Amino acid sequence: MAPGRGVLLLICLCLMDNVSQVVCSQNSTTPSKFPTFYSYDCNADTYAPQLTSFSTIWTLLNVLVMTIACVIYLIYMCFNKFVATMTNT
């Protein structure tokens, strides 16, 4: 048996020893805070997103980071093109 195979087997045995089963005490899920969100009457025109929710803040932060990254990249590319054009003439 290869030396690495024994270590892998030992790790697998340790992980399999700690496997347990989780038993739920309730059979139902908690009710939604917004029960009309999944109804057919709710669409983009009638559903108002909350600007203070975590997902909205996270999305706006991602948009800001991507915008800054694109601006930095475009400035870098334009500067390199400008320098290359100036040195060729």
Curated annotation (Swiss-Prot):
Gene from which this protein is expressed: gN
Regions that span the bilayer: 57-77
Quaternary structure and partners: Interacts (via N-terminus) with gM (via N-terminus). The gM-gN heterodimer forms the gCII complex.
Record-linked HAMAP family: HSV_GN
Pfam family, one: Herpes_UL73
Segments on the Intravirion face: 78-89
Record-level GO cellular component terms: host cell Golgi apparatus; host cell membrane; membrane; viral envelope; virion membrane
Location of this chain's protein in the cell: Virion membrane; Host membrane; Host Golgi apparatus, Host trans-Golgi network
Domain of life the protein comes from: Viruses
Keywords for this protein: Disulfide bond, Host Golgi apparatus, Host membrane, Membrane, Signal, Transmembrane, Transmembrane helix, Viral envelope protein, Virion
Virion surface side stretches: 25-56
Organism of this sequence: Equine herpesvirus 2 (strain 86/87) (EHV-2)
Family recorded in the similarity comment: Belongs to the herpesviridae glycoprotein N family.
Membrane topology field: Single-pass type I membrane protein
Leader sequence segment: 1-24
Name listed for the protein in its UniProt record: Envelope glycoprotein N
Primary site of residence: virion
Function statement: Envelope glycoprotein necessary for proper maturation of gM and modulation of its membrane fusion activity. Also plays a critical role in virion morphogenesis.
